[in-house]
Amino acid sequence: MDPEAKVSSSRRRDLPPIPQGQRRTPRALPSMPSQDTAEEMPAPKSRKKKAKRDAESVDEPDDGGMEMGGLASRRQSECPEPLTPEPLDNPPQRRKKKKKAQAIDAEGDQTDLVSNGDTLDQNTDEEVTRKPKKRKVKPKVTETQSNNELDVEDDDVITDPQSPIPQHSLFSAPQGPSQPVGKVFVEKSRRFQAADRVEQWKPSGPIEQSIMDIRSMWTTRDVSMRVHSGFRVIGLFSHGFLAGYAVWNIIVVYVLAGDQMSSLSNLLQQFHTLAYPAQSLLYLLLALSTVSAFDRVNLAKAPAAMRSLLRLSPVALASVFYFSALVLSLSQQMTSDRINLYKYSSYNTTLWPPGSESSILYPWITVNLVVSLLVGLAWILMSTSPDIDNTEAFLMSMEMEYPNSEEKGNVTA
């Protein structure tokens, strides 16, 4: 015979009859906690300890131990998979089974008078009543909420282009005007000593050395730029000096000639020693000023120079005035030679025949006056536009090709 049947038969035999007035109605199960509270409850203890405690109660010799053993064996028969781990897909269902087992253990001592049929009916009723509560409602709510959250609204659509976010470095040096320092401190023999910055920098590699070599090499453009800048300074000086000298020359001539050119002989006697040097200096200054003015116009590009002249550019007009004054000054070179040789007129009457002073000196004085006016106007025009220099701009626009290291080696060899 099966030992479970023996335990059940002995139990039915030993139980006294229960009067009708004391028979209890089936107790209602305590309300099951919600899923939220079930999640917060601590995990139930393993059933190995419960199985051990039930085995000890079965070994006791009294009837109460037999009753507990029967209940434990019946519970084991009702729950054939107590020790197998349930799948993790449905954790709330596993906790419900554990909670049901705990409720049955707590009521084991108080329901000794209840028959097996009543307990089975009660268990079936519990399962029937708990099945409707297993409906999953929250996933549907979350799906609807997620659908509502994913709905696109008009306020969420941004049509304006977003301005780029300026990215500033967190560790950046303050942007201020840097002030170069002429001295640097170099550590020598465990002490810092002041030294010049230029002397300390030396090329540390072949690349820097090649860069220094290229910088030290002068190209044709560099030479022309240096010459042009130097001659420009000389030209500016010659413009001003020529204007002052031309005015001084014409004033001296008119003072010595007297009122209405009445004392031309006095002019010849006083000015014959200065005629030749004065004419030579005037010619030199006119030549320098004319070349300087032509450099400003940039005659290398004839069409551009003609366009500037047609537009009446100040530099172009000044160059024309200087050139005209130079031509007029050269036309009176023979007269200046005659004035210089006036001291020898007693020996050679053909140079200065008697009564020929007025016919020779009138054109010379008039030409000198025109030269003075042209030089003065040209100087004024050059002063109004000192920054215009087309030749310098043309030289800066030239592209130079630096020689390779091999070509350089061949040239130096």
From Swiss-Prot:
Disruption phenotype: Fishes lacking both tmem237a and tmem237b display defects in midsomitic embryos, including shortening of the anterior-posterior axis and small anterior structures, kinking of the notochord, and broadening and thinning of the somite.
Example of a GO cellular component annotation carried by this entry: ciliary transition zone
Xref: InterPro entries: TMEM237
Topology versus the membrane: Multi-pass membrane protein
Stretches for region Disordered: 1-162
Pfam families, sorted: TMEM237
Keyword Transmembrane listed: yes
Location relative to the cell: Membrane; Cell projection, Cilium
Residue spans of biased composition, Polar residues class: 112-122
KW Amino-acid biosynthesis (keyword) present: no
Keywords: Cell projection, Cilium, Cilium biogenesis/degradation, Membrane, Transmembrane, Transmembrane helix
Gene Ontology terms describing biological process: cilium assembly; convergent extension involved in gastrulation; regulation of Wnt signaling pathway
Source taxon at top rank: Eukaryota
Annotated transmembrane regions: 233-253, 274-294, 312-332, 360-380
Function field: Component of the transition zone in primary cilia. Required for ciliogenesis.
Alphabetical list of PANTHER family matching this protein: TRANSMEMBRANE PROTEIN 237
Family classification: Belongs to the TMEM237 family.
Protein name: Transmembrane protein 237B
Organism: Danio rerio
Lineage: Eukaryota, Metazoa, Chordata, Craniata, Vertebrata
